């Protein structure tokens, strides 16, 4: 499970600055989803091979009423959702009554909480630690969020009990496929727990109904118990002798209950389900068409690089004209996930639900297959031969060879010269070429460029004495010849 870190504290202690710094390497993927997050902002970040979800909360002033009312509702929810709470205080302003009240609340919640003394510039760190020691939450971690000072130490402390990502592939870790061998699947979770499938979507689009339908007749359910964290449920089951694990974020329900209930949407559970899954089934309400919240949620899956299958639910009962309009909208607005299979289903009646499994299998296979360097390089050479990279100044971008850099999603590393100047349109061309030739379906593909160093850069020509003398004689000869030509004129 991906750990969740919440930033809490009173106003103007630097929470948003800290949030922006921590999510800078990977763009924040959620920013105040209207009607869903309100005062909370969610982001995804990674530090030394560990992914985590970051929550930025509104400030807590604590200047009136009791603590339960002073603590904003959204900040309370963020604390409940979090595995770790980073309690930011202002080292310049010192220990305040609001800090004391927030600290007391955190102690009562028995959360893993750390005091972070921000704005430590030009302040004695030992004095800052002593200033905030009365809160009883351990020594304060001194940082300067605006300048990045102390951030590594803070993250080391916050994440030290969490393992590195299971699918983290360091450079060179992917084994090479021998020449002449066929592409192979990288051994993954399917061999043990089955393909992990996360079913996500907006509230009330039919996720609960689809979950129950997939776990219904002709399925072998091993067990159905609530997960230990934030009510997510991991349900192993089998279908046609294939193993799967369904990650259900909609909460506990009776197996025989098919009708849809109003679901409480949780950004954290959705993000965690996506990160923990091998394949995401994204459910949309066909009768409502494509809405902005759908695009935001699809952005989660795309950012995480997960294989994707799209299910248009409630397809039954729509007129041919309505269906045609929805298909046009899908083509127009979902162009950025055009690699995903789209299924038109009725979770309530079961129409088309069985077809989802083949797309899940195909998507997972595409996401974890590996190819030899020779194969990827040949595809690159053919692509360049058919459509060469553009000229940059008087020189053409050169792409030399390619190799596999990771899986789930496939990462293809291309080496060459001036690669930092490759335009986005050409990157898209290469992505489409690899997708077409390798017959990839249902998975995003990522391309990373690495420039080659010039081995002669910085070297100067060193002439021998003989070469120097010859150069002088030639220059003298040319000067005499030029003088004769001028005299004749």
Swiss-Prot record:
GO terms for molecular function: GTP binding; ribosome binding. One of its GO terms (biological process) is ribosome biogenesis. GTP 2 binds at residues 201-208, 248-252, 313-316. Gene3D superfamilies: 3.30.300.20, P-loop containing nucleotide triphosphate hydrolases. Keywords: GTP-binding, Nucleotide-binding, Repeat, Ribosome biogenesis. Residues 369-453 form the KH-like domain. GTP 1 binds at residues 9-16, 56-60, 118-121. Residues 469-489 have a biased composition (Basic residues). InterPro entries: G_ENGA (IPR031166), GTP-bd (IPR006073), GTPase_Der (IPR016484), KH_dom-like (IPR032859), KH_dom-like_a/b (IPR015946), P-loop_NTPase (IPR027417), Small_GTP-bd (IPR005225). The keyword Lyase does not apply. Residues 451-489 are annotated as: Disordered. Residues 3-166, 195-368 form the EngA-type G domain. GTPase that plays an essential role in the late steps of ribosome biogenesis. Belongs to the TRAFAC class TrmE-Era-EngA-EngB-Septin-like GTPase superfamily. EngA (Der) GTPase family. NCBIfam families: GTPase_EngA, small_GTP. Associates with the 50S ribosomal subunit. HAMAP family: GTPase_Der. This is GTPase Der. It comes from Pseudomonas syringae pv. tomato (strain ATCC BAA-871 / DC3000).
């Amino acid at each position: 499970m991906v750990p969740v870190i919440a930033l809490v504290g009173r106003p103007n202690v630097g929470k948003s600055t800290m949030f922006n710094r921590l999510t800078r390497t990977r763009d924040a993927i959620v920013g105040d989803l209207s009607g869903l997050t309100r005062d909370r902002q969610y982001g995804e970040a990674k530090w030394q091979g560990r992914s985590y979800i970051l929550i930025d909360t509104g400030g807590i002033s604590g200047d009136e009423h009791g603590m339960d009312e002073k603590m904003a509702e959204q900040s309370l929810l963020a604390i409940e959702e979090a595995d770790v709470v980073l309690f930011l205080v202002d080292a310049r302003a010192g220990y305040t009554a609001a800090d004391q009240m927030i600290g007391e609340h955190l102690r009562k919640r028995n959360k893993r909480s750390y005091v972070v003394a921000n704005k430590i510039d030009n302040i004695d760190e030992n004095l800052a630690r002593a200033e905030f020691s009365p809160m009883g939450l351990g020594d304060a971690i001194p940082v300067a969020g605006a300048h990045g000072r102390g951030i590594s130490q803070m993250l080391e402390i916050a994440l030290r009990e969490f393992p590195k990502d299971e699918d983290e592939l360091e450079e060179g870790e992917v084994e090479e496929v021998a020449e002449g061998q066929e592409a192979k699947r990288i051994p993954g979770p399917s061999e043990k727990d089955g393909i992990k499938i996360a079913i996500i979507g907006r509230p009330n689009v039919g996720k609960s109904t689809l979950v129950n339908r997939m776990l219904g007749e002709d399925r072998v359910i091993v067990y159905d118990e609530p997960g230990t964290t934030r009510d997510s449920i991991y349900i192993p089951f089998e279908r046609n002798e294939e193993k799967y694990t369904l990650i259900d974020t909609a909460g506990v329900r009776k197996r025989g209950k098919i009708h849809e209930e109003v679901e409480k949407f949780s950004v954290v559970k959705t993000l965690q389900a996506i990160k923990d899954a091998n394949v995401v089934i994204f459910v949309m309400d066909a009768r409502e068409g494509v809405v902005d919240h759908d695009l935001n949620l699809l952005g989660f899956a795309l950012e995480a690089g997960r294989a994707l299958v799209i299910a248009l639910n409630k397809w039954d009962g729509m007129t041919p004209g309505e269906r045609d309009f929805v298909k046009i909208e899908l083509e127009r607005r979902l162009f950025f996930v055009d690699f995903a299979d789209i299924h038109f289903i009725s979770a309530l009646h079961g129409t088309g639900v069985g077809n989802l499994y083949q797309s899940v299998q195909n998507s997972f296979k595409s996401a974890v297959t590996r190819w030899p360097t020779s194969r990827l390089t040949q595809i690159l050479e053919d692509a360049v031969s058919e459509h060469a990279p553009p000229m940059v100044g008087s020189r053409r971008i050169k792409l030399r060879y390619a190799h596999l850099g990771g899986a789930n999603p496939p990462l293809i590393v291309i080496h060459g010269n001036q690669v930092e100047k490759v335009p986005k349109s050409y990157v898209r061309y290469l992505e489409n070429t690899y997708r077409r030739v390798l017959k990839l379906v249902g998975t995003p593909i990522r391309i990373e460029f690495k420039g080659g160093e010039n081995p002669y850069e910085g070297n100067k020509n060193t002439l021998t004495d003989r070469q120097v003398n010859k150069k002088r004689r030639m220059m003298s000869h040319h000067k005499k010849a030029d003088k004769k030509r001028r005299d004749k004129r």
